[in-house]
């Protein structure tokens, strides 16, 4: 909860600074002189409310959504020795990481993958694919679980949702400023909001949304390195490197995890060049090298 309050306070501070800065540079006067009557402070608050609403709602229902979209079956009473081992391993890693025992589940997928989600580090879900359990060694599975526990302990799900809320706010804000500018200044519309406003706003939201996604995905890639470090601390550097190397061997397999969950998996696929800027995970080679340098 403290993390949420700090991010909300930070966002409100940024909103205030942005509003004051635009006013100091005469943006309000420029827009008013061209027939655009905008209350930037009110617009920023409006965008902040709606920008955060979606990301926070997604965060609070993330466990439910993950179970529904991946078909994850929660292990409440272990029926096999593999399930018993999985529960015991997660409990051990959680205790070492200083968090409460998360829910543990298995989802039906051939590819080797795992994810962690939940609105609170003490109310989380950790799930692994059937393929990972079948083909990875116990040490490799333990390292993958340690990586996911690292995400939970670091509060990555909350932080990522709040970062998304911040960028949502400014995408909405600047898209509407651009829409008003095009409608009032370029098309000289003097009666309400014309079609140019809506078209320009939609186009601006699409373009700014792509740029904002690059920011969010950059942060997501940073958190993967941190989770790898946490996994190395909990399971050992050699085991963490071994798990990532095994994932690299299987990288050609299609990832069937829903798009909404790929950012939370340990294996995010492979893309290079400009497309790499929109990837939630850094290349496995970079992650392995970072762990080797860490020693």
From Swiss-Prot:
Required co-factors: Zn(2+)
Coiled-coil parts of chain: none
Cofactor binding, per record: Binds 1 zinc ion per subunit.
Pfam families membership: Peptidase_M48
Main location: membrane
Subcellular locations according to the entry: Cell inner membrane
Annotated keywords: Cell inner membrane, Cell membrane, Hydrolase, Membrane, Metal-binding, Metalloprotease, Protease, Transmembrane, Transmembrane helix, Zinc
Top-level class of the enzyme under EC nomenclature: hydrolase
CDD domains: M48B_HtpX_like
GO molecular function, one term: zinc ion binding
EC number(s) recorded for this UniProt protein: 3.4.24.-
Name this polypeptide is given: Protease HtpX
Source organism of the structure: Pseudomonas putida (strain ATCC 47054 / DSM 6125 / CFBP 8728 / NCIMB 11950 / KT2440)
Gene that this sequence comes from: htpX
């Amino acid at each position: 909860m403290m993390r949420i309050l700090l991010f909300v306070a930070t966002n409100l501070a940024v909103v205030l600074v942005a509003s004051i800065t635009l006013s100091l540079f005469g943006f309000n006067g420029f827009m008013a002189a061209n027939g655009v009557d905008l209350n930037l402070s009110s617009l920023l608050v409006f965008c902040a409310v709606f920008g955060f609403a979606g990301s926070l709602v997604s965060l609070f229902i993330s466990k439910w959504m993950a179970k529904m979209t991946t078909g994850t079956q929660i292990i409440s009473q272990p029926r096999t020795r593999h399930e018993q081992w999985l529960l015991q391993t997660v409990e051990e890693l959680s205790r070492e990481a200083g968090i409460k025992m998360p829910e543990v589940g298995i989802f039906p997928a051939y590819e080797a993958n795992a994810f962690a989600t939940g609105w609170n580090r003490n109310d989380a879900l950790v799930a692994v694919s059937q393929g990972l359990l079948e083909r990875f060694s116990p040490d490799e599975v333990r390292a993958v679980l340690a990586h996911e526990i690292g995400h939970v302990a670091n509060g990555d799900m909350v932080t990522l949702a709040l970062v998304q809320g911040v960028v949502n706010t400014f995408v909405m804000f600047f898209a509407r400023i651009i829409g008003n500018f095009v409608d009032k200044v370029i098309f000289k519309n003097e009666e309400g909001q014309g079609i140019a406003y809506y078209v320009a706003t939609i186009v601006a939201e699409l373009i700014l949304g792509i740029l904002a996604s690059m920011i969010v995905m950059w942060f997501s890639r940073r958190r993967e390195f941190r989770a790898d470090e946490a996994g190395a601390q909990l399971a050992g550097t050699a085991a963490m490197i071994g798990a990532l190397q095994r994932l690299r061997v299987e990288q050609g397999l299609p990832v069937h995890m829903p798009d909404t969950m790929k950012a939370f998996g340990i294996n995010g696929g492979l893309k290079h060049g400009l497309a790499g800027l929109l990837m939630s995970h850094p290349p496995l080679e970079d992650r392995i090298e970072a762990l080797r340098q860490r020693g």
